[in-house]
Structures are given as structure tokens and as C-alpha cells.
Regions:
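C-terminal substrate-binding/catalytic lobe of Rossmann-fold NAD(P)-dependent oxidoreductases
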Residues: 18, 30, 37-70, 166-304
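Glycine-rich Rossmann-fold phosphate-binding loop(s) that bind the pyrophosphate
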Residues: 24
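Hydrophobic/small residue at the entry helix of a nucleotide-binding pocket
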Residues: 27
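Rossmann-fold NAD(P) dinucleotide-binding segment
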Residues: 72-73, 87-106
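N-terminal Rossmann-like NAD(P) cofactor-binding module of classical short-chain dehydrogenase/reductase
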Residues: 79-82, 104
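Rossmann-fold NAD(P)-binding glycine/threonine-rich loop
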Residues: 107-131
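Oxidoreductase and adenylate-handling cofactor-binding alpha/beta cores
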Residues: 141-157, 172-182, 306
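NAD(P)-dependent Rossmann-like dehydrogenase/reductase catalytic/cofactor-binding core
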Residues: 281-342
């Protein structure tokens, strides 16, 4: 495992796409692994707010730099994949770095995507770069499937179910409760609701009818379990609108049984065709993920290839998954794709 190769590398002479990673948490580590699986790409640098000497990466040919040195790399990186959080990092970081690099991010605050798009678009055009935002699986792959399904079945209803999987935001909310030492929260689709949609019943579903929440909580010594459970179940914006189950377990059990970050979900559209709307159809796209951040990272890396291709064509400005032709995601040529996948 590499530890102390710090900055100063010259641009590689190989023809691979040069990738930079900004932020080395779960998502950044996932990007590093994904780059390894793509033969046309090369990780050249990881940028961190921490002391670079304290950051251990896996790629022996890449270097670790402080974010303060990022401008020195403007001509050495083809695409910068920004792996910060949506709450406070990405709204600031992506516009700043879009002036210097082609950039990819996973901004997932749905209500603020139009605002974020406008900010990144202005910055990317100013710098002459391509920025692709809100890349991942929701937003991202789920968004694409909603668009395809709406275009194909204009008379219909959309349904999205998440899980079963770990919600990192809700897990953080549990851990903020007084008396909680540690915890994980799983979002679980209600099977009866999912079955009704698949049967073409077009149900009108409330928040509570679509998902349940299951919490596994480690208490601080001497904490009041009943009080903690009540505070979790009544927490607005997180648990109060759901049927929530709280399990109290030991730290050992949590570490043993709940250390992974699985997730997934379903996007469905139920629609009808025919002059009298006599025929019903269901479109369904589903994901079952052992590692939410590693899958998201794999999507980010595919869209990094698209950003590189668009930049080579002279394009600039902000894009989303809606704007990228599928062929731009692939390392294969058009001829190869038509022969092997079409």
C-alpha cells in the first residue's frame, strides 16, 4: 500500500485518460478501484484536505497531494472526479474546479440540482471545460430509466422504491441522538406496495406505505433505551413518517453483522397503450448493490470517459446523465458497439 509519494509527477506519456480524485473517503477509494478496471484510464493523483503523508492509497503510480496544490495539475489531468458530500462540499467545489478541469460529481440533493447545474455551467464555460453533475444511481441510472420509461409510456405512473440498504444520512441521524454510541439504518421497500405496482394496480401510495425503516443501535453505557427509541421514531424528516423498528445490539454485533454499505432499489413505470388503453405494461429497472459507494464510483468513472470525449470534441459547460449519448460511456468504438451490443 502506497503512502508517501507526494506531488510533483510529470504528465505521463501514455495515451490513457488521466484521472484525478478529489477527496479520499469511501467514494474516492471506490473510484480508485474502478479506474483499475478500465484499461483506457490511469489514476495520476489524489487530492486531500488532510496531510498527504497520512493518506494511504493503493495505486503505486499515483501521487497524493494537498488540495492547495491542485492548480499545478491543470495540464496533467484529463478529468477530475470530485468525491465530496452534497450538503456542503460539492456546491462549492464543483464550480471552482470546473474552471480548471473537466469534472464529474455525484451531487444528490434533488431539489437543488437546477441551481447546482447553473453554477457549474457558468464555471465550466468560463474555463472551457465539461462538467457532468449528479452522476450515480439516484440521481443517475434511476433518472435515466425514469426518462426512458416516461418517453415510451406517456400515459402512466412512476414509482421508485429504495432498498433494502443502508441509508448513510439516516444512520448519521441515529448517531446524533443522545445516548447512542453507534448505529446503522436500513431502508426497506414494503413488499405489498411493490407487488401492487408490479401487478399494474397503479396504487396511490403514501410515504409510510412505500418504505419501512429498521435501525440497529448501540447504546452508550447507562443510556435510556426507551427514550432513545422514542426520539428516533419521532424524528421529523427522517423517521416520523415511517413505520420504524429499533433493535438494540452490542458494538460487536454491529461490527460483525452490519459493517457493509449495501443498497439498491427499483424504478417502475406502469402505463397503458392501445386506442382504448386496453393493454397494460410495466417497465422495471432494479439494482442490488453490495457496496453503494463502489457502485456509485463505477458510474462516475464511466461518465468521466464521456466528459473526456466531449472535451476532445470542443464542447464545454455542464451536462447531466440526460445529455450524454450512451456510446460516450463506452471504451469501445461505434463499430464495436454495433457488432457486439446492439
Amino acid at each position: 500500500m502506497q503512502s508517501r509519494r507526494i506531488c510533483g509527477a510529470k504528465r505521463s506519456l501514455s495515451m490513457s485518460i488521466k484521472i484525478g480524485i478529489l477527496g479520499y473517503g469511501n467514494l474516492g477509494r471506490g473510484v480508485e478501484c474502478a479506474v483499475k478496471q478500465n484499461d483506457d484510464m490511469e489514476l495520476v493523483a489524489v487530492f486531500t484536505r488532510r496531510n498527504p503523508e497520512d493518506v494511504k492509497i493503493l495505486t503505486e503510480t499515483a501521487v497524493v497531494c494537498n488540495v492547495a496544490d491542485v492548480e499545478d495539475w491543470k495540464d496533467k489531468i484529463d478529468v477530475m472526479i470530485i468525491c465530496g458530500g452534497s450538503a456542503t462540499d460539492l456546491p462549492k467545489q464543483t464550480p471552482v474546479y470546473a474552471k480548471m478541469f473537466n469534472v464529474i460529481d455525484s451531487f444528490d440533493t434533488h431539489a437543488r440540482i437546477p441551481e447546482h447545474f447553473a453554477n457549474v455551467d457558468a464555471a465550466a464555460k468560463e474555463g472551457g471545460h465539461v462538467g457532468i453533475i449528479s452522476v450515480g444511481w439516484d440521481p443517475g441510472m434511476f433518472s435515466l430509466n425514469r426518462l426512458y420509461a416516461n418517453a415510451i409510456l406517456p400515459d402512466g405512473n412512476d414509482y421508485t422504491f429504495w432498498g433494502k440498504g443502508v441509508s448513510q444520512g439516516h444512520s448519521d441521524a441515529i448517531r446524533r441522538v443522545e445516548g447512542v454510541k453507534d448505529g446503522k439504518q436500513y431502508t426497506i421497500p414494503v413488499e405489498a406496495a411493490l407487488k401492487a405496482v408490479r401487478n399494474g394496480e397503479n396504487p396511490e401510495l403514501t410515504t409510510r406505505q412505500k418504505h419501512t425503516r429498521e435501525c440497529f443501535v448501540v447504546l452508550e453505557e447507562g443510556a435510556d433505551a426507551a427514550k432513545v427509541e422514542e426520539e428516533i421514531k419521532t424524528m421529523p424528516n427522517y423517521f416520523s413518517d415511517y413505520d420504524t423498528t429499533v433493535h438494540f445490539i452490542s458494538q460487536e454485533e454491529l461490527d460483525r453483522d452490519h459493517s457493509k454499505i449495501p443498497h439498491g432499489g427499483f424504478v417502475l413505470r406502469s402505463g397503458c397503450t392501445g386506442w382504448e388503453k386496453e393493454n397494460k405494461h410495466i417497465i422495471e429497472y432494479s439494482l442490488k448493490l453490495d457496496s453503494n459507494p463502489e457502485f456509485t464510483s463505477s458510474v462516475l468513472v464511466a461518465y468521466a470517459r464521456a466528459a473526456y470525449k466531449l472535451s476532445k470534441e470542443g464542447q464545454s459547460g455542464c451536462k447531466t446523465v440526460f445529455d450524454i449519448a450512451p456510446a460516450y460511456l463506452s471504451a469501445k468504438s461505434g463499430d464495436e458497439l454495433r457488432a457486439s451490443l446492439l
